[in-house]
């Protein structure tokens, strides 16, 4: 998957693909951000939502005080993106939908 398409967007901190059990398959993160923790969190969120809501595919956007997290379940695994809260969220969503 072309992660650099996402990570080239200003204020995107990183992107990656995780397995359903939270292991990193592929990632590109800036220095100081942990791909392993993000992958584990993404897998936990997807698994919890699937279990609670009994649905097939999951796509989630979390807004926090300083960051935005995108999580989308794909054929290749669980795709996740972390960015600053003032990143171009619309552009990030468009790029995610193009490559997943």
Segments (PLM) and residue ranges:
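Non-catalytic interaction/Regulatory regions outside core domains
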Residues: 1-100
